[in-house]
């Protein structure tokens, strides 16, 4: 209690000063206010003096600031504590009055409430502030104020009519032809934001129709409210540049591309080549990037109408190639013909073609007296322009191990070892070797506009890799993969990843088969298998909303995966034609001399995240993660590597990786004298929810409070794992954990220490009366399950 006895701000303030305790907005209106919540959020931005925040929910931040602001408080830790605190939010009537005037002006000038009135009232109260403890009693009486802003908006004016005027008749004719897409129409409420959007729309349409020099500055908005009604006639007046009476339209002229531009270049040193009416100048003997690729990345041509969107697409595409450090597009009117715009495209390549990147990662977790420490070393070698077409080739290798430590039992020992090598080739163009994209477009599965954008901006990815995982004295897995697909990000920022072709060969070796002697379904999931996709392997759609004005943002990740469906259909067709009843597989006698079955399953996973920023130092993050995998054909179980698990530093943090579940089943191995740090509890269905409150503590130290809940279930009843299958009682099998975290925030990454406590068990214990842990049982968990990792869990 030593820190708390004097945490009183009042004794540092003058007698005439008082703290702001709260602010709110109260609407007074006889009629319904359109979009009231949005209007309130807009008005709240004008309130400058808000109540001070608290550190760790009970220590006033203004007290920390004032306590370390004396003349003698000049040491480094005083500066740090002042930065941690906040200047006191002192009530000032002149500030509140200014806020009232700003709100009133905003309602009248921006939102169409021309008769709006704003006032305020102050509610004073004598509050007892300070702290009382067994050691001391330091409580003061101090005046605090609650400020209520009373907003009487009155009736909102509407748009009676919309008209466009200009002396440039050709321009005016074009503008009127596009008015169906206008942001301001008859019957709309008066809104300055919508007016600005309409000006922007008009300017953009004109810039995409040859009017390269047009801008919003040429558009004036006039309104006629001479009548007594609440409707206004709106006129968009389009001025012409003096002394002209019209705006100049441009067509594209000469296009010069400098493929290896440096400032010291002179035209005498350059070699000229031409392709598709584009001049390519180079200083090097050979082209760094194929001119055909550069030509296809330039979306405007000589003699065509000048369009702003084509220049932006060109800039984006050339930058996305990854070969050039700087991309500059300069334009200038032709010296002879004033309606022609010439272009110089300056491309400055990176000096290094090969780059190397390395990383060292680690994590730490606990389970009772057991400790698990994981470390991995990774290195990546990348070529920015492998074949002269800006192809990005990367070779990534990773080596990792997990060390277990159980004091007094086994000491330190290696629990897992893993190694992986992955080759990737990214081609910055759409290479539809199989013709699937064109087929989907021609059959109407995708729209014309989307297909055209996909063809222009999609990248082609080819991958080939190997990984090996060895759970020592348990099982090992060797996996080989090969994929071919496309990666496309739309103008709105939505990402599409489509892999029509993909193969995964998974080879298992079980060291301890006795562990699965009573669990045949688990044993089947460890069968050697080949995952296949000849036309469709998997598809991912990632939606990112961006942050709204209220601090909300959403991230949604959808993944749909299918394996073996082409093999299954072909096998069934063969059986129908031949009258056979065979199930195709790769039998012994192959190069590996192993029986390999075709993996047949359908898998879907949803990961939805919501982030809410309350301020620069406080936010709330939440996640809902759902998944299901269904085997089909003769497969009784889906591959172990594609099943779902919960627990670990990025899931249920009170449990270790794959410790909880499935369902209400409890792994008998956890009852052994030596606690198991490596678990294999997985399922076909996953439900998980997480919520985390994040806040700043001091300098680079952040804090978090979190709750995690979820479990996995099997699709089918398993005699060897009672209560593992999904049922109507699944809610009673939800595991719940809670805890707190400390994060060292280094901007680009953070090191995370999470302390998770089991709050609710997913299974019923015959000894304990409830699945909920008592407060005493939670305290007995000590520091809880300690998880140390890098970056946020979601």
Regions found by a protein language model. Give the residues of each.
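A generic beta-sheet turn/junction motif
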Residues: 349-351, 562, 615, 744-748
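Gram-negative/organellar outer-membrane beta-barrel architecture
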Residues: 171-174, 287-288, 307-556, 653-654, ...
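C-terminal motif of bacterial Sec signal peptides marking the signal peptidase cleavage site
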Residues: 4-6
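Conserved C-terminal beta-signal and adjacent last beta-strands/turns
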Residues: 687-695, 703, 709, 734-746, ...
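Membrane-embedded beta-strand positions of outer-membrane beta-barrel proteins
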Residues: 356-360, 393-397, 462-464, 556-560, ...
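C-terminal outer-membrane beta-barrel translocator/porin domains of Gram-negative envelope proteins
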Residues: 279, 361-370, 497-695, 705-728
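Periplasmic polypeptide-binding modules associated with outer-membrane biogenesis and secretion
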Residues: 8-364, 375, 397-398, 403, ...
């Amino acid at each position: 209690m030593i820190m708390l006895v004097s945490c009183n701000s009042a004794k540092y303030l003058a007698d005439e000063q008082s703290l702001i305790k709260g602010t709110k907005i109260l609407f007074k209106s006889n009629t319904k206010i359109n979009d009231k919540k949005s209007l309130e959020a807009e008005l709240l931005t004008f309130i400058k003096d808000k109540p001070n925040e608290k550190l760790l929910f009970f220590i006033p931040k203004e007290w920390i600031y004032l306590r370390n602001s004396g003349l003698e408080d000049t040491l480094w830790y005083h500066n740090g504590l002042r930065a941690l605190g906040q200047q006191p939010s002192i009530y000032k009537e002149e500030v509140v009055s200014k806020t009232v005037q700003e709100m009133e002006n905003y309602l009248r000038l921006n939102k169409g409430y021309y008769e709006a009135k704003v006032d305020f009232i102050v509610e004073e109260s004598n509050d007892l502030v300070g702290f009382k403890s067994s050691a001391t009693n330091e409580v003061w009486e101090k005046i605090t104020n609650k400020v209520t802003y009373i907003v009487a908006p009155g009736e909102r004016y509407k748009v009676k009519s919309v008209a466009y005027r200009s002396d440039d008749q050709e321009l005016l004719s074009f503008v009127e032809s596009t008015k169906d897409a206008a942001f301001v129409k008859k019957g709309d409420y008066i809104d300055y934001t919508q007016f600005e959007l309409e000006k922007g729309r008009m300017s953009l349409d004109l810039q995409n129709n040859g009017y390269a020099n047009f801008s919003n500055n040429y558009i004036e908005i006039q309104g006629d409210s001479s009548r007594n009604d609440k409707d206004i006639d709106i006129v968009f007046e389009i001025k012409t540049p003096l002394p002209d009476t019209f705006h100049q339209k441009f067509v594209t002229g000469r296009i010069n591309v400098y493929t290896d531009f440096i400032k010291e270049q002179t035209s005498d040193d350059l070699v000229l080549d031409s392709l598709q009416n584009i001049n390519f100048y180079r200083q090097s003997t050979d082209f760094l990037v194929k001119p055909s690729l550069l030509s296809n990345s330039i979306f405007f041509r000589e003699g065509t109408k000048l369009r702003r969107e084509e220049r932006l697409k060109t800039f984006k595409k050339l930058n996305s190639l990854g070969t050039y450090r700087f991309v500059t597009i300069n334009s200038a009117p032709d010296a002879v013909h004033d309606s022609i715009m010439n272009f110089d495209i300056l491309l400055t390549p990176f000096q290094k073609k090969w780059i190397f990147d390395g990383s060292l990662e680690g994590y730490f977790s606990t389970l009772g007296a057991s400790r698990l420490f994981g470390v991995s070393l990774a290195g990546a070698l990348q070529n920015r322009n492998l074949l002269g077409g800006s192809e990005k080739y990367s070779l990534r290798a990773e080596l990792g191990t997990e060390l277990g430590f159980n004091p007094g039992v086994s000491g330190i020992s290696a629990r897992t070892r893993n190694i992986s090598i992955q080759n990737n080739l990214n081609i910055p163009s759409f290479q539809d070797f199989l013709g699937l994209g064109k087929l989907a477009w021609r059959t109407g599965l995708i729209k014309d506009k989307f297909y055209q954008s996909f063809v222009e901006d999609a990248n082609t990815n080819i991958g080939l890799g190997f990984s090996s995982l060895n759970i020592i004295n348990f099982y090992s897995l060797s996996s080989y993969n090969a994929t071919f697909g496309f990666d496309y990000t739309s103008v709105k920022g939505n990402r599409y990843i489509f892999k029509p072709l993909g193969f995964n060969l998974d080879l298992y070796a079980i060291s301890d088969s006795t562990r699965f002697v009573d669990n045949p379904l688990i044993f089947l999931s460890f069968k050697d298998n080949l995952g296949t996709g000849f036309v469709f392997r998997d598809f991912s759609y990632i939606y990112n909303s961006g942050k709204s004005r209220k601090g909300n943002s959403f991230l949604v990740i959808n993944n749909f995966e299918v394996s073996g469906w082409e093999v299954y259909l072909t096998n069934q067709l063969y059986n129908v034609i031949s009258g056979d009843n065979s199930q195709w597989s790769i039998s012994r006698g192959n190069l590996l001399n192993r029986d390999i079955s075709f993996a047949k399953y359908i898998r879907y996973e949803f990961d939805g995240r919501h982030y809410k920023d309350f301020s620069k130092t406080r936010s709330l993050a939440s996640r809902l993660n759902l998944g299901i995998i269904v085997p089909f054909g003769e497969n009784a179980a889906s591959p172990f590597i594609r099943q779902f698990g919960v627990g670990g530093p990025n899931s249920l943090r009170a449990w270790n990786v794959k410790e909880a579940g499935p369902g209400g089943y409890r792994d008998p191995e956890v009852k052994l004298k030596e606690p198991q740090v490596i678990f294999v509890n997985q399922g076909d269905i996953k439900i998980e929810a997480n919520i985390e409150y994040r806040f700043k503590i001091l300098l680079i130290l952040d804090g978090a409070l979190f709750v995690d809940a979820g479990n996995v279930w099997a699709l089918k009843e398993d005699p060897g794992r009672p209560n593992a299958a999904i049922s109507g009682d699944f809610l009673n099998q939800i595991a719940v954990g809670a805890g707190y975290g400390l994060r060292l925030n280094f901007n680009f990454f953070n090191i995370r220490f999470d302390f998770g406590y089991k709050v609710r068990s997913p299974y019923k214990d015959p000894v304990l009366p409830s699945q909920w842990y008592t407060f005493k049982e939670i305290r007995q968990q000590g520091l809880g399950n300690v998880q140390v990792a890098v970056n946020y869990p979601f």
